[in-house]
């Protein structure tokens, strides 16, 4: 039987900024990998039925061992977890996950309509289950009456943000020049999981590929630098396609572990909650 709510966990990143030789998703945090902790949260939310982990080729066996570990399988049940090969860029990985979901649905002679997908980063492994459930619920509410087609968690921007430019000619050539200061009251930092109507996210991805004249099959196979315009989250694709998405206040624990400093902060949080 196919799922009504899927999750895709992006875990193919190298994590060089974190300072470990191991890819970021597989770095241990207080004895449990970031990937396992992110799956713990998805399962505990009781909102996700099936999760697909997207990894690089060299970490596929490691990921398979993690998701097939009997203790993990029991811990995450009834949510099921499987592994698929991701891509060179985040977009490629998520698109590969969407293709995998479509294969499952086609095999069962079912369609994407009425289903949802939550796209999550393994690096946001402390995201509270209650927040995940709230984002899924908000997406469901909008799709039910066609008011919106997805929901994303967002965090306030506390710093003053500057738009900059780097002119290559003129008196300021070689300098970083401040162009403008947007009002931070209207700015938010996007977090994950981002939850969408499955059919609409597939459509948004296909529109993006058509716009850039890249075939779907080529997109799945690409490795390395992408010729596509940079897309750093899935809500951006929904925006481009004209599908409304609403924002949900995120819990600060939905922080992304990217640098060594982030890692130390996460350790302190866990030491306080698990001690």
UniProtKB/Swiss-Prot annotation:
Its EC number is 2.7.7.60. The record marks 17, 24 as: Transition state stabilizer. GO terms for molecular function: 2-C-methyl-D-erythritol 4-phosphate cytidylyltransferase activity. GO terms for biological process: isopentenyl diphosphate biosynthetic process, methylerythritol 4-phosphate pathway. InterPro entries: IspD (IPR001228), IspD/TarI (IPR034683), IspD/TarI_cytidylyltransf_bact (IPR050088), Nucleotide-diphossugar_trans (IPR029044). Keywords: Isoprene biosynthesis, Nucleotidyltransferase, Transferase. Pathway: Isoprenoid biosynthesis; isopentenyl diphosphate biosynthesis via DXP pathway; isopentenyl diphosphate from 1-deoxy-D-xylulose 5-phosphate: step 2/6. It is an enzyme of class 2 (transferase). It catalyses: 2-C-methyl-D-erythritol 4-phosphate + CTP + H(+) = 4-CDP-2-C-methyl-D-erythritol + diphosphate. The record marks 184, 256 as: Positions MEP for the nucleophilic attack. The keyword Nucleotidyltransferase applies. It comes from the Bacteria. Catalyzes the formation of 4-diphosphocytidyl-2-C-methyl-D-erythritol from CTP and 2-C-methyl-D-erythritol 4-phosphate (MEP). Belongs to the IspD/TarI cytidylyltransferase family. IspD subfamily. This is 2-C-methyl-D-erythritol 4-phosphate cytidylyltransferase. The gene is ispD.
């Amino acid at each position: 039987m196919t799922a009504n709510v899927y999750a895709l966990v992006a875990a193919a990143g190298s994590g060089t900024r974190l300072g470990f030789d191991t890819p970021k998703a597989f770095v241990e945090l207080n004895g449990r990998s970031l990937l396992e902790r992110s799956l713990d949260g998805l399962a505990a939310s009781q909102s996700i039925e099936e999760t697909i982990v997207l990894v690089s080729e060299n970490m596929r066996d490691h990921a398979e061992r993690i998701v097939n570990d009997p203790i993990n399988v029991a811990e995450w049940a009834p949510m099921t977890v499987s592994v698929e090969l991701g891509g060179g860029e985040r977009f490629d990985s998520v698109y590969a996950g969407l293709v995998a979901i479509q294969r499952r649905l086609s095999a069962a002679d079912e369609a994407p309509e009425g289903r949802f997908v939550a796209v999550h980063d393994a690096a946001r492994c402390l995201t509270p289950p209650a927040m995940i459930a709230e984002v899924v619920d908000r997406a469901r509410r909008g799709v039910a009456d066609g008011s919106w087609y997805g929901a994303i968690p967002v965090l306030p921007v506390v710093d003053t943000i500057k738009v900059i430019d780097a002119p290559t000619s003129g008196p300021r050539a070689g300098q970083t020049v401040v162009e403008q200061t947007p009002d931070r009251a209207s700015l938010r930092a996007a977090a994950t999981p981002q939850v969408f109507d499955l059919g609409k996210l597939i459509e948004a991805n296909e529109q993006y590929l058509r716009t850039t004249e890249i075939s779907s099959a080529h997109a799945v196979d690409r490795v390395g630098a992408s010729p596509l315009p940079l897309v750093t989250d899935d809500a951006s694709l929904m925006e481009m396609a004209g599908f409304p998405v609403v924002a949900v206040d995120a819990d600060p624990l939905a922080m992304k572990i990217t640098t060594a400093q982030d890692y130390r902060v996460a350790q302190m949080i866990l030491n306080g909650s698990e001690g």
